[in-house]
């Protein structure tokens, strides 16, 4: 497909990794995801995490109520795994289609992960059930150990946790989310398995860790996993350009109020929902790989999750689009990814 293309029409994509938060933030940010994406995997790490069916049903209702009328958006709900998760609740939630998967957060590895797993061996009985019922496991793949350099935590997690896990449960469907390193890419490619995939964010494709320190510290580029060396950014860009079916779109859009991003203990997360699809198409164009854009955005994810591919389409046009400087929510603001900057692509109205 020509890199000089002025318009591209694709099957409407899904976002396989979204943080919508709750309350006033939810009411504002859900519109962006609901506009660009047909379905989205909703992360369960609220302050009161989505650990059971009741909370999931209630949260899903709040999401749908936050949408503008006639928005044909489908939130896909995930169970937050703890060491107290009930096997019966997990299985019932999956069979009743309340949950489409379960999320493993290593303890205190990211936002609202204090209820996460301290010892993965303590939930092997849950993985045994999930493997049998074909319930996907979504993983924040970082080893949370102060003795491990924070830039090495993904690679160490793969070596110390993921490899033994997959050896024990070879037919457990696993999504290694928001991958950031050559090591993650190599492992997924070497396995080349229908039971293992990775999602990739727009910010890890567009930026590397140098960008966090240009003209001073850039708190709005602080995310977990962190931006990595340029060689890892290049590896991510190369793998999506290869057309590999083992990787798909997961924006990890993660809103926080501006005041919580710039304070002494700033929150990790990049709110990219207003621009994520435009960022992805820009990278595919730069890599002269637009022929693989639809597969990455709209086909690889549903195929991995054994879900139907969407019937609707969306059209992107080569027309400059300026990202909002800020988004007002009551007396607070959220600063989106690439705030105030122009992208070469827009969504056709």
Curated annotation (Swiss-Prot):
Keyword set includes Metal-binding: yes
Keywords per UniProt: Hydrolase, Metal-binding, Pyrimidine biosynthesis, Zinc
Pathway info: Pyrimidine metabolism; UMP biosynthesis via de novo pathway; (S)-dihydroorotate from bicarbonate: step 3/3
Gene3D superfamilies in UniProt: Metal-dependent hydrolases
One GO term describing the cellular component: cytosol
Co-factor note (free text): Binds 2 Zn(2+) ions per subunit.
Active site per UniProt: 252
InterPro entries, per the entry: Amidohydro-rel, DHOdimr, Dihydroorotase_CS, Metal_Hydrolase
Catalytic activity line of the entry: (S)-dihydroorotate + H2O = N-carbamoyl-L-aspartate + H(+)
Sequence positions bearing N6-carboxylysine: 103
PROSITE patterns xref list: DIHYDROOROTASE_1 (PS00482), DIHYDROOROTASE_2 (PS00483)
Binding residues for Zn(2+) 1: 17, 19, 103, 252
Binding of substrate, residues: 19-21, 45, 140, 224, 256, 268
Keyword Zinc: yes
GO BP terms in the entry: 'de novo' pyrimidine nucleobase biosynthetic process; 'de novo' UMP biosynthetic process
Cofactor entry: Zn(2+)
Binding site for Zn(2+) 2: 103, 140, 178
EC numbers: 3.5.2.3
Molecular function terms from GO: dihydroorotase activity; zinc ion binding
Oligomeric form and interacting partners: Homodimer.
Function statement: Catalyzes the reversible cyclization of carbamoyl aspartate to dihydroorotate.
Family, similarity comment: Belongs to the metallo-dependent hydrolases superfamily. DHOase family. Class II DHOase subfamily.
Cited PANTHER family: DIHYDROOROTASE
NCBIfam families: pyrC_dimer
Name recorded for this polypeptide: Dihydroorotase
Lineage, top ranks: Bacteria, Pseudomonadati, Pseudomonadota, Gammaproteobacteria, Enterobacterales
